[in-house]
Amino acid sequence: MAVEQFAESRSLWLKITAWEKAVVVHEVAKLAKPKLVLEIGAYVGYSAMNIARAVRPHGGRVVSLEVDPMHVTIVRNMVEYAGVSDHVDVWTGYCYDVIPHLLDIYGPHSIGMVFMDQKGTRFHTDLQLMEELGLLADGAVVLADNVLKPGAPLYIWHLMHGPYRNCTSVSVREFLLQSEDWMVMGFHDASLPPVAPPPTQLNRVAFESDAFRKRSMFDSVAPSKSDWWAFSQRFVDGLERSGCKPPVVGLHGRDNPVIKPEDIAGIFRSAGRLPPPPPQGTA
């Protein structure tokens, strides 16, 4: 995409889900075939355009939420310029105010995919709101970015101990950086019981995640690469001690993880959402 090329040509890091992250988002949307996708955190519209291209062939629609009015204006112009505005609606406001309107407009069990790219320590609360409103279709796929950096431990707990199956962490490179990040996904199963309360130590990990996120917003106190690496180790250790470290796919080398479309297809097969591949040598 032009947004990605612009950033690469200037070595300018942008908060966009590019490189392997773009592959994950596109493949999940393409394989899930949702009629309605909810994106939380539009930024400049990069992911909204990516998802729209994936769901357009089967008539899917994207509702993208953004709290910043300036970014909303940018996204609306970007999707128009990209030729996908007929498949994308951009709404302004906070999740707890805006999400209930989805029920009024689209009805219950209407959301087939959720992509979350807002504040990581809010992933689980926004997801719980959708559950309480009955917005998620059975089998809806939920995907979130930046789950390792700056981290969303309570979201992982929610997927592994709540009404979801096949929680999987996809290891990817951060755009224009060589650092590892996780995108974590799962499939909604309404027959499972509500999530149990997380252990206290996981709340402490979430507190530290939020502190690192706030530090990263200011150059004078931004974490160094070694700070991030040490925090990532503590993050993973905290998940393991809490019994909620999901299986990881896509990590084909710690310093240069590469995700491939077949990795995403494998997750969908494990969840029973795709048939098994034909035997080798079969036409």
Q: Regions from the language model: what does each represent?
A:
Residues 1-36:
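Class I SAM-dependent transferase core
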Residues 59-66:
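Conserved SAM-binding motif I beta-strand of class I
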Residues 68-113, 121:
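S-adenosyl-L-methionine
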Residues 57-58, 81-85, 134-136, 164:
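Short helix-capping segments at alpha-helix termini
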